């Protein structure tokens, strides 16, 4: 999203087609009891263009490389190439089975990173924008899990209506698509009585990385889901 804004700065009368998402079900072991139940597949396609009806946009991007191996797929790069051996599933200490070509996540480290670092980043961004939480209509965050978003909401001191966390039970965690999925799912309620909402978007995940954008979002001409049958193929 930030890169789209940067491109539009140099192309005033153009549009950017932003495509984001993942097929996580093909990257998570079916016997991974920690990650498999919340996994979802999704892709979001957004048309980004300049508007004369919105104000300044504030953004922040941060990374913590020390915790990079909290969420990663061990094999597939030059350090650990894919071989017959990397495709063999093994059981970890918690009873989860996965191979080196599948997603491995240390949930406790990721949770602590989200809960400790995200509120700080959001507060810093609002200070930069000279804004207060009461003036922000919605906090649309990456939908990692219901529990994580509930705790993040408590740390931020905002209501359930302002920071929804109901996406994972319906669509699953679809990685980078969860923010547009959340926006689309709640679109009719969010814009029922308003044509513009002030929204804080916040994302966190692999890297470990954080990103936030504070902006005015106008009512879209088109915002819909298109559902496709899910393949049961195990890749």
Region locations from a protein language model:
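Acidic, glycine-rich active-site loops and adjacent beta-strand->loop/helix elements
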Residues: 20-26, 62-64, 170, 203-208
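Flexible, glycine-rich active-site loops centered on histidine and acidic residues
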Residues: 5, 9-43
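Claisen-condensing/thiolase-fold acyl-transfer catalytic domains that form or cleave C-C bonds
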Residues: 1-9, 115, 119, 137-235
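Condensing-enzyme catalytic core mediating Claisen C-C bond formation in acyl metabolism
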Residues: 32-112, 116, 120, 216-235
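Acidic-glycine-rich active-site phosphate/pyrophosphate-binding loop
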Residues: 18-24, 89-95, 148-161
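Structural motif
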Residues: 14-17, 44-46, 55, 198-199
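Internal helical hairpin/lid segments
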Residues: 106-110, 119-147
């Amino acid at each position: 999203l930030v890169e789209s804004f940067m491109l539009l700065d140099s192309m005033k009368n153009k549009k950017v087609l932003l495509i984001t998402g993942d097929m996580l079900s093909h990257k998570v072991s079916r016997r991974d009891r920690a990650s498999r139940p919340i996994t979802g597949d999704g892709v979001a396609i957004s048309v980004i263009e300049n508007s004369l009806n919105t104000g300044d946009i504030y953004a922040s991007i941060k990374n913590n490389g020390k915790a990079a191996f909290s969420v990663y797929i061990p094999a597939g790069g030059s350090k650990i190439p894919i071989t017959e051996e990397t495709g063999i599933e093994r059981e970890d200490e918690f009873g989860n089975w996965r191979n080196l070509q599948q997603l491995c996540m240390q949930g406790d480290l990721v949770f602590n990173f989200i809960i400790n670092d995200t509120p700080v980043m959001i507060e810093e961004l609002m200070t930069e924008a000279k804004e207060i939480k009461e003036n922000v209509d919605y906090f649309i965050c990456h939908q990692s899990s219901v529990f994580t978003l509930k705790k993040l909401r408590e740390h931020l001191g905002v209501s359930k209506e302002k920071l929804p966390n109901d996406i994972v039970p319906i669509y699953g965690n679809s990685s980078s698509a969860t923010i547009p999925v959340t926006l689309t799912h709640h679109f009719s309620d969010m814009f029922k009585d308003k044509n513009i909402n002030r929204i804080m978007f916040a994302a966190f995940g692999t890297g470990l990385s954080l990103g936030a954008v504070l902006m005015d979002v106008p009512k879209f001409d088109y915002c819909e889901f298109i559902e496709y049958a899910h393949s049961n193929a195990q890749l």
